[in-house]
């Protein structure tokens, strides 16, 4: 591909040079003054001061000393007739001698005929020239593009505010000689070959043309075997048909190979160049070039007998043509170096002409342009009170809506309106007292083409004819008497018109009109311009200034362009891009960026070059690991058996990754590491055989290069992995497969040399022997790391900078990067041109400025931040400029944006190097860090450039100050040279940001016990827990967190076993309320019951308990409960933590013991006590952590656990019966009913006796306890509605030493 591109570039340069050399107008000394010696009659103007005319040549001092119009306004102009078509390369101006009259800005127009003027354009826009600042100074302008014309017109735009318009002018250039032939739409010019067939491997065809119509054949040639070449004008665009494949398809049914140009029927000159070498071709119309490849079996174009210009004559039928002929003029036709028109003028035998002229005669058609949608109009008089009406004209526009014609009819006939409505013509005749007439015809008439309209009203019949289609006009036969009026308003209505002379129910027309006829009489629009007929406002007379803003198409990445008269719009649907010109990718550039924005694992589209030309590619991002793996699948990752193959008939498999090789290369080059797993199985099938001989099996990688090394080997060394491990099956071989044994062997490992990846093809040639077999498996492409997201440098002095090649951003420029600094100001980057420039800087601690000049004055965007930007935190900047708008974005602050003016579609021309972190003057440089610099989506390697410069160091620390908050759930931010990472050691979660919950399913017998003894290692290195719990410590601050999901109530969630038989248990009561039960002293126990919904509802709930001194807070989901301890109550030394069922029941509180029989059935996640994560230790570090697991513990996400999953876990029910009727919020189990009536009766009897005994004991203990409890400190009194729920619980084992209390909150 690269070689082809280089060939095309060289070819284009060479052929373009030959083409320009062939033009007879070429003159390297084309700068002679052309107006100095002209007769005064060669100058003409819109008006003259006091009716006196003074020759306006440069340095003229006689008479009035130059030209001034009678009135200084925007409608004045000065015109020069240069006698013949000349080439104009420069202009100069002065003010009027001895006066205060001079022009400060002006425009140029040129023409061949003195009519149908063309405005001079530069940078694809109507150019405004800078004029004078005094009367005597000469301001000279060299034209970027020369003009070829006979007439030149200077149009003043602005002038000295203390004087009037005054000009003396000069035009520089040289004579222009050309060969012209004119076609009248019925003629052709034939160039016949000296031999029967002209067979060419390369062709160069160039010409210029001026067309009077939108359709016609410029030239055509064909061969008998089917080759042909045709250039045809179709609806104002040039279509090229070129075929070398020998097919004999008819020209009328095949599609053109290329279509270029637009509005080419404007009666102006347009250039065409076709260059072909074999199947490669360049097609250029004016300055727009399209490269394409021709289909075909050969490289030669075979044309028989002749080339025809102007039409396609039918053989043996004189005067008959296959398609519509060309009507217009063609200039300087060169076919492979042969001047065709020169041969015709000299009447050489190769030329056969039919009714052609060697001059360019064109009708004097005067177009007009309506430029303003609010105030443009043209008033023309008519002959009133004629019975009937006749109006016709041509129009062209891009707007869907606009008033074309409004006239008040005589004799009370009403008002006639012709409107362009939604691209259709709508004729209305409105009457006050009766129903009027409405005719609608046509569609999509806002296509920019010329359309003819004719309105005729005669004998109660109204006819609307569109595009001369007299066979099917739109009719209305209403009984209406129509009498013509005396005023016809075209395009709009005057602002000061208050009566019904002109009605406009829609906005004014913007577009061009010509050939206006009223009552079958043509209207002289030059007379209107001179003020001798009619009136007008905001018109350009004698030119049509329509512009195709969609050519070239500035909508990038396949965006669809639509336009109106003043601007264009881009439809970016289904492109993967957004923005005014579809420039900005909607996708991120790597999985690392997706991770940084909080996304989890899944399929994503990655756009490696952002706004660059490469499209997005679908990948899988595994964002659950510390290394963010990006996986690109291909079309065959399964184990595949090799068919019979040998050296003559090799087996080959090609891999398709769903994207282009350029996309894959960009993805790989932007990654830190890439690999593909390769496994090759073999039995009596060689792989390499020898390290220096031809291999039997190889693979194709990047750039279509062949590779002979395999997994684990060094690139370009023909070996396999077993050589380095010294375990090959045959020590004489370099691969296991080369042992050539009858048993299966394999080679497996990873290919990881990025410059060779991905694997695009595998070829095998040794499976044709007896019992010879082979199979392979090529894994997907996997990469991790983003080389550019953390690519950072530090600028240490104001004079330091990095320089890069010139930023080429003529039509679109986007710049993005991160920065952090403590400086007050500094320039981030700067790029200069001759006049153009762009600069991005921090102008103050809270202001970012983006300044850009594309030749029409600087545009400055400013964002003021409400917070300081020099806070040594990372901040993001993105600046963009395109043909529609300029914008600046800082962090998430509101964007600053400015739309481009209607004519400000200028190219940005930069010539200097791009300075990053400073300026060319080495002043006002940036001090601080910058990273991830992207220019038009392209990654810029700051680190590599910094290695070559002083005052700039690679890398930048301090990422955690900005991104430390991304480490969630207790994770710790760890600085790295390129970015940061989250240490999840002290977090119950895991993952890149410690956001992935570690969760597991429990059944009724599952128990996870964490013993608090000595500190333990949680990873394979020597890192210890940052806050380990020692056996003899008693922290004053405690935190317990867990998430749970269950459908079982009552149940036990967590149990903390302290010394001296103290405990804390988290339970669910019978009705699903949360209960916290604990005993933290020898004298009392506490039970807190939260009045919440039933938490055993199969949904995930979160519990967080904090104890800070005497204050206890319990957060249940979004509800917060608080309680104050007695200051003397403290947590004692913790011995163990149990999740699920408590297996060591000795000394277990009786109430807790009853619930413990059931265990826990459900899911627990994110369990944490202070810095200890017991569930994480059980699942991830069971071999080294002091944790034991009994029963079945199944790792599973709680969010993905269904009710059926929870219910499916085995549940054990208690056989104990509660003592008496208890509150449902108490943590007691339900009685299990027996199916046997006998057993039920026995149990009932035993229960009755037991109740009697317990009743006597309760009475005795109550009296004893009351005397003891009166000495205890009184707790907080609760309201009366809770007093009934408050009661003392009884500890059957420690009745003499405990006062147990329960609270409902």
From Swiss-Prot:
Q: Which organism is it from?
A: Rattus norvegicus
How does it sit in the bilayer? Single-pass type I membrane protein
Specify the superkingdom: Eukaryota
Q: Where is the Laminin G-like domain?
A: 180-360, 367-544, 791-956, 1014-1198
Signal sequence bounds: 1-24
Limits of the EGF-like domain: 546-583, 957-995
Q: What are the transmembrane regions?
A: 1238-1258
Supply the CDD domains for this chain.
EGF_CA, FA58C, LamG
Taken from the UniProt entry, a GO cellular component term is: membrane
Keywords from UniProt, A to Z, are: Cell adhesion, Disulfide bond, EGF-like domain, Glycoprotein, Membrane, Repeat, Signal, Transmembrane, Transmembrane helix
The record's subcellular locations are: Membrane
Residues on the membrane's Extracellular side span: 25-1237
Q: Which protein family is named in the record? A: Belongs to the neurexin family.
* Free-text function comment from the UniProt entry: May play a role in the correct development and proper functioning of the peripheral and central nervous system and be involved in cell adhesion and intercellular communication.
Query: Which residues are in the F5/8 type C domain?
Result: 30-174
InterPro entries on file: ConA-like_dom_sf, EGF-like_dom, FA58C, Fibrinogen-like_C, Fibrinogen_a/b/g_C_dom, Galactose-bd-like_sf, Laminin_G, Neurexin-related_CASP
User: In terms of one coarse class, where is the protein primarily found?
Assistant: membrane
Per its UniProt record, what PANTHER family does this chain match? CONTACTIN-ASSOCIATED PROTEIN-LIKE 5 (PTHR15036:SF46), PIKACHURIN-LIKE PROTEIN (PTHR15036)
All copies of the Fibrinogen C-terminal domain together span 584-790
* Disulfide bond annotation, renumbered to this chain: 30-174, 329-360, 512-544, 550-561, 555-570, 572-582, 929-956, 960-973, 967-982, 984-994, 1163-1198
Q: Does the keyword Disulfide bond apply?
A: yes
Residues annotated as glycosylated: 282, 496, 571, 622, 1057
* Cross-referenced Pfam families: F5_F8_type_C, Laminin_G_2
**Protein known as:** Contactin-associated protein like 5-4
> Lineage of the native species?
Eukaryota, Metazoa, Chordata, Craniata, Vertebrata
């Amino acid at each position: 591909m690269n070689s082809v591109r280089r060939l095309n570039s060289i070819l284009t340069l060479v052929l373009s040079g030959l083409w320009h050399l062939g033009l007879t107008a070429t003159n390297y000394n084309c700068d002679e003054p052309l107006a100095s010696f002209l007769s005064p009659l060669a100058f003409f103007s819109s008006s003259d001061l006091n009716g006196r005319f003074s020759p306006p040549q440069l340095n003229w001092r006689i008479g009035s000393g130059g030209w001034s119009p009678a009135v200084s306004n925007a409608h004045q102009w000065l015109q020069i007739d240069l006698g013949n078509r000349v080439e104009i390369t420069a202009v100069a101006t002065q003010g009027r001698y001895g006066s205060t009259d001079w022009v400060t800005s002006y425009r140029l127009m040129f023409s061949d005929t003195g009519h149908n003027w063309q405005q001079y354009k530069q940078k694809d826009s109507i150019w405004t020239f800078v004029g004078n600042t005094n009367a005597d100074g000469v301001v000279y302008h060299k034209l970027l593009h020369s003009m070829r014309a006979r007439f030149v017109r200077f149009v003043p735009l602005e002038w000295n505010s203390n004087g009037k318009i005054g000009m003396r002018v000069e035009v520089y250039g040289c004579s222009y000689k050309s060969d012209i032939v004119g076609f009248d739409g019925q003629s052709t010019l034939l160039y016949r070959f000296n031999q029967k067939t002209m067979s060419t491997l390369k062709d160069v065809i160039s010409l210029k043309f001026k067309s009077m119509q939108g359709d016609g054949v410029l030239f055509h040639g064909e061969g008998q075997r089917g080759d042909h070449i045709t250039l045809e004008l179709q609806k104002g665009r040039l279509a090229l048909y070129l075929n070398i494949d020998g097919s004999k398809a008819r020209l009328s049914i095949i599609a053109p190979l290329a279509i270029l140009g637009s509005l080419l029927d404007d009666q102006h000159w347009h250039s065409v160049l076709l260059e072909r070498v074999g199947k490669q071709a360049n097609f250029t119309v004016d300055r727009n070039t399209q490269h394409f490849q021709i289909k075909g079996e050969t490289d030669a174009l075979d044309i028989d007998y002749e080339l025809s210009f102007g039409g396609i004559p039918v053989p043996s039928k004189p005067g008959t043509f296959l398609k519509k002929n060309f009507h217009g003029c063609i200039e300087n036709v060169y076919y492979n170096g042969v001047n065709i028109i020169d041969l015709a003028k000299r009447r050489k035998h190769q030329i056969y002409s039919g009714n052609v002229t060697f001059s360019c005669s064109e009708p004097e058609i005067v177009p007009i342009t309506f430029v303003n949608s609010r105030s443009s109009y043209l008033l023309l008089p008519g002959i009133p009170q004629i019975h009937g009406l006749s109006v016709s004209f041509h129009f062209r526009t891009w707007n869907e809506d606009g008033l074309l014609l409004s006239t008040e009819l005589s004799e009370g006939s009403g008002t006639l309106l012709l409107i362009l409505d939604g691209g259709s013509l709508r004729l209305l005749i409105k009457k006050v007292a009766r129903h009027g007439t409405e005719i609608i015809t046509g569609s999509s008439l806002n296509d920019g083409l010329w359309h003819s309209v004719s309105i005729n009203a005669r004998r109660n019949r109204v006819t609307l004819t569109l595009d001369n289609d007299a066979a099917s006009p739109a009719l209305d036969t209403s009984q209406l008497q129509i009498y013509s009026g005396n005023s016809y308003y075209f395009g709009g209505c005057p602002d000061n018109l208050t009566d019904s002379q002109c009605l406009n129910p829609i906005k004014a027309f913007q577009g061009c009109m010509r050939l206006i006829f009223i009552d079958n009489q043509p209207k002289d629009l030059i007379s209107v311009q001179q003020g001798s007929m009619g009136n007008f406002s905001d018109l350009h007379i004698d030119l049509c200034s329509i512009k195709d803003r969609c050519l070239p198409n500035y909508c990038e990445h396949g965006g669809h362009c639509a336009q109106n008269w003043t601007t264009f719009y881009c439809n970016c649907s289904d492109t993967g891009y957004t923005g005014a010109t579809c420039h900005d990718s909607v996708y991120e550039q790597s999985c690392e960026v997706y991770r940084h924005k909080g996304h989890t694992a899944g399929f994503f589209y990655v756009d490696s070059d952002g706004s660059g030309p490469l499209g997005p590619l679908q990948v899988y991002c595994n964002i659950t690991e510390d290394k963010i793996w990006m996986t690109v699948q291909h079309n065959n990752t399964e184990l595949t058996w090799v068919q019979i193959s040998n050296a003559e008939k090799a087996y080959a498999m090609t891999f398709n990754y769903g994207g282009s090789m350029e996309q894959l290369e960009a993805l790989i080059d932007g990654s830190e590491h890439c690999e593909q797993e390769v496994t090759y199985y073999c039995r009596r099938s060689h792989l390499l055989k020898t390290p220096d001989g031809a291999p039997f099996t190889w693979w194709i990688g990047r750039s279509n290069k062949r590779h002979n090394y395999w997994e684990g080997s060094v690139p370009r060394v023909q070996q396999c992995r077993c050589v380095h491990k010294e375990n090959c099956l045959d020590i004489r071989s370099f691969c296991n497969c080369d042992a050539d044994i009858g048993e299966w062997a394999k080679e497996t490992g990873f290919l990881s040399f990025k410059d060779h990846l991905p694997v695009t093809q595998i070829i095998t040639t040794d499976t044709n022997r007896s019992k010879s077999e082979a199979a392979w498996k090529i894994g997907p492409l996997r990469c991790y790391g983003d080389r550019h997201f953390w690519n950072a440098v530090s600028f240490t002095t104001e004079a330091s900078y990095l320089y890069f090649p010139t930023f080429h951003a003529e039509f679109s420029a986007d710049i993005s990067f991160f920065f952090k600094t403590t400086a007050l100001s500094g320039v981030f980057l700067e790029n200069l041109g001759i006049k153009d420039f762009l600069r991005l800087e921090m102008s103050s601690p809270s202001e970012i400025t983006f300044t850009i000049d594309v030749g029409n004055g600087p545009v400055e965007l400013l964002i003021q931040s409400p917070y300081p930007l020099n806070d040594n935190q990372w901040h993001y900047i993105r600046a963009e400029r395109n043909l529609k708008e300029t914008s600046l974005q800082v962090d998430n602050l509101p964007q600053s944006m400015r739309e481009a003016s209607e004519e400000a579609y200028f190219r940005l021309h930069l010539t200097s190097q791009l300075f990053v972190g400073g300026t060319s003057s080495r002043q006002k440089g940036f001090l601080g860090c910058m990273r991830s610099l992207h220019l038009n989506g392209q990654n810029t390697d700051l680190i590599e450039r910094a290695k070559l410069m002083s005052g700039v160091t690679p890398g930048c620390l301090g990422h955690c100050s900005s991104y430390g908050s991304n480490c969630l759930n207790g994770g710790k931010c760890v600085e790295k040279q390129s970015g940061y990472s989250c240490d999840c050691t002290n977090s119950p979660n895991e993952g890149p940001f410690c956001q992935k919950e570690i969760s597991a399913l429990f059944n009724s017998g599952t128990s996870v016990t964490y013993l608090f003894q000595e500190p333990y290692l949680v990873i394979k290195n020597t890192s210890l827990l940052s806050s380990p719990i020692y056996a003899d410590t008693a922290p004053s601050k405690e935190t317990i967190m867990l998430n749970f999901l269950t459908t079982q109530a009552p149940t036990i969630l967590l149990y903390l076993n302290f010394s001296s038989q103290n405990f804390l248990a988290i339970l669910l009561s019978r009705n699903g309320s949360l209960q916290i039960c604990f005993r933290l002293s020898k004298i009392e126990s506490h039970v807190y019951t939260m009045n919440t919904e039933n938490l055993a509802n199969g949904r995930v709930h979160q519990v967080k308990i904090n104890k800070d001194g005497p204050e206890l807070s319990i957060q249940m989901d979004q509800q917060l409960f608080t309680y104050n301890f007695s200051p003397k109550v403290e947590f004692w030394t913790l011995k163990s933590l149990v999740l699920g069922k408590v297996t060591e029941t000795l000394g277990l509180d009786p109430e807790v013991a009853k619930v413990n029989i059931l265990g826990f059935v459900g899911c627990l996640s994110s369990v944490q006590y202070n810095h200890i994560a017991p569930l994480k230790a059980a699942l991830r570090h069971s071999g080294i952590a002091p944790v034991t697991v009994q029963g079945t513990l199944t790792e599973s996400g709680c969010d993905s656990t269904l009710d059926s999953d929870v219910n499916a876990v085995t549940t054990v029910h208690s056989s104990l019966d509660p003592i008496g009727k208890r509150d449902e919020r108490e943590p007691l189990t339900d009685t299990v009913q027996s199916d046997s009536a006998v057993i039920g009766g026995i149990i009932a009897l035993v229960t009755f006796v037991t109740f009697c005994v317990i009743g006597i004991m309760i009475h005795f203990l109550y009296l004893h306890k009351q005397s003891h409890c009166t000495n205890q400190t009184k707790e907080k009194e609760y309201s009366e509605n809770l007093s009934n729920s408050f009661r003392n619980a009884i500890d059957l084992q420690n009745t003499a030493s405990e006062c147990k209390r329960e609270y409902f909150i």
